[in-house]
From Swiss-Prot:
Ranges of biased composition (kind: Gly residues): 75-85
Transmembrane segment boundaries: none
Name the UniProt record assigns to this protein: Transcription factor IWS1
Nucleus as UniProt keyword: yes
Species whose genome carries this gene: Eremothecium gossypii (strain ATCC 10895 / CBS 109.51 / FGSC 9923 / NRRL Y-1056)
Keyword Nucleus in record: yes
PANTHER family linked: PROTEIN IWS1 HOMOLOG (PTHR46010:SF1)
Length: 370
């Protein structure tokens, strides 16, 4: 009875002085403990969500499971130091979970990636060949039917995809190994009607070819070198593209002839320079040039007005009649032949000509008939 009376008296005193009772203190402790547990569980659920989102890039052996971690409960013993230590331990565990482990790629993954890239390049190669074949068929139909509405647009439509693949540096070896340059050669070849491909196709493909590490074996396998040489010699190719083709040919032929691209290894031909010989040659050339100029001036002086006018109009003119004087008479080297023909007088041999006799007889007959 005394104990109960003391409890009641304590409760009454606490109520009187505004102090919390023992029951209220216990309830408050349980509420604090519940809040701490709920907050820890909420943090663990967030970490579990983060861990599951990163599972695609991690191996199965390195996966972390939040559910396996023990949940630290906080008691209502009022020990602040112990509570802070457990909280720090939980935070340390969560920091370890947040650290993303390095992804380890196995050899099998690398082989799968190479196989995927090879298949991608081979599919693009087939698409390029089909597009070129369709354009050729379209041009052949246009030549046969004469219908100018038939336009070959397959290669132009596929061009952006081709250029995007050719410009990727990480695909350079795959492109060369799968002989995609053969399809590039087909695209650059002249069309059945003798015309060249679209200028956009020429410009884009030559720019992409320039960035590829093409070697001699790749040129032999694809046949691209012949088409590039054609572009260096054709007069229908744009000037900048022709110069780019010349540069590519020079770069590709350098390892074939054993030439180095280092300027220090460049061989410069040298020869001795004779100053006196150069002066004599220059004087002789100047004398010849003066003689030619003088002859040209004399020729202009002797031309008639008609010839000068024709020369100004860049026309041909009939040569003017001139009188030629000879200082020395030619000497005959033909021996005198003794004949029975009378050589005295001008036209003395006409009477001995049979043709002349026949003409005279005809003239005489015509006079008699009159």
């Amino acid at each position: 009875m005394s104990g109960s009376s003391s409890v009641h008296s304590g409760t009454a005193a606490s109520e009187e002085w505004g102090m919390p009772s023992v029951g209220e203190i216990g309830a408050a402790g349980e509420a604090v403990e519940t809040n701490e547990v709920e907050r820890a569980q909420h943090q663990e659920r967030q970490r579990k969500h983060i861990a599951t989102s990163d599972n695609d890039e991690e191996e199965s052996g390195n996966k972390w499971s939040v559910s396996t971690l023990p949940i630290t409960s906080y008691g209502g013993d009022g020990d602040a130091a112990g509570g802070s230590g457990r909280r720090q331990a939980l935070e340390a565990k969560m920091e370890r979970l947040l650290k993303k482990p390095k992804a380890r790629h196995s050899r099998q993954d690398e082989e799968d990636l190479e196989q995927y890239l090879d298949e991608k390049i081979l599919r693009l190669k087939d698409e390029m060949n089909m597009a070129a074949q369709k354009d050729i068929e379209t041009l052949n139909r246009r030549l046969e039917t004469g219908d100018n509405r038939l336009i070959a647009m397959e290669k132009v439509t596929l061009l952006p995809k081709v250029i995007s693949v050719l410009n990727k540096a990480n695909l350079a070896d795959t492109i060369l190994d799968n002989n995609l340059l053969q399809s590039v050669r087909i695209w650059l070849e002249p069309l059945p009607d003798g015309s060249l491909p679209s200028f956009e196709i020429q410009k884009s493909l030559f720019a992409a070819i320039e960035n590829l590490p093409i070697k001699t074996e790749h040129l032999k396998e694809s046949g691209l070198g012949k088409v590039v040489i054609f572009y260096t010699k054709s007069k229908r190719v744009e000037h900048k593209l022709a110069r780019l083709a010349d540069r590519l040919v020079a770069e590709w032929t350098r390892p074939i002839i054993g030439a180095s691209d280092n300027y220090r290894d460049k061989r410069v031909l040298k020869m001795d320079f004779d100053v006196e010989k150069h002066r004599k040659k220059a004087a002789l050339d100047s004398a010849k040039s003066k003689k030619r100029r003088k002859a040209a001036v004399d020729e202009e002086k002797h031309k008639s007005l008609y010839e000068l006018a024709a020369a100004k109009r860049n026309r041909a003119a009939a040569p003017a009649q001139t009188t030629t004087d000879y200082k020395y008479a030619p000497v005959s080297n033909i021996s005198n032949v003794q004949t029975g023909i009378r050589t005295a007088g001008v036209g003395s041999t006409l009477n001995n000509n049979d043709l002349y006799k026949r003409l005279n007889s005809r003239l005489a007959k015509s006079k008699r008939s009159k």
